Amino acid sequence: MAKTPVRARKRVKKQVVDGVAHIHASFNNTIVTITDRQGNALAWATAGGSGFRGSRKSTPFAAQVAAERCAEMVKEFGLKNLEVMVKGPGPGRESTIRALNAAGFRITNITDVTPIPHNGCRPPKKRRV
């Protein structure tokens, strides 16, 4: 008996006007995720996934390229306004916000959500190079 071919259903692109850009800027990489207000991910991009490897991942330019790639993916959703949440101490913090602004989004709010311990775990020992 022949199997009927399975057809992939075409996903309907929902229209989202307001979104949230989550920027995770570590010392080694930058991850940009754009979600809707409820937290459902629309698109994401990283500096490493944008073609930068090794120490070049941790540059502001790599973070800028990752933000531009993420912005291009989100254009088809009709996104206009962005709220930016930045986490981490990395070098790609400011350049990512500048790239999102240059991509044509109206940035309504910038929030720093870097987790700060209230004297939690003991930090790692200092590096001796």
UniProtKB/Swiss-Prot annotation:
GO molecular function: rRNA binding; structural constituent of ribosome
UniProt superkingdom: Bacteria
Keywords: Ribonucleoprotein, Ribosomal protein, RNA-binding, rRNA-binding
Pfam families: Ribosomal_S11
GO cellular component: ribonucleoprotein complex; ribosome
UniProt-listed GO biological process terms: translation
InterPro entries on file: Ribosomal_uS11, Ribosomal_uS11_bac-type, Ribosomal_uS11_CS, Ribosomal_uS11_sf
Family, similarity comment: Belongs to the universal ribosomal protein uS11 family.
Subunit organization: Part of the 30S ribosomal subunit. Interacts with proteins S7 and S18. Binds to IF-3.
Protein function: Located on the platform of the 30S subunit, it bridges several disparate RNA helices of the 16S rRNA. Forms part of the Shine-Dalgarno cleft in the 70S ribosome.
NCBIfam families hit by this protein: PRK05309.1, uS11_bact
Identification of the protein by name: Small ribosomal subunit protein uS11
Native organism: Actinobacillus succinogenes (strain ATCC 55618 / DSM 22257 / CCUG 43843 / 130Z)
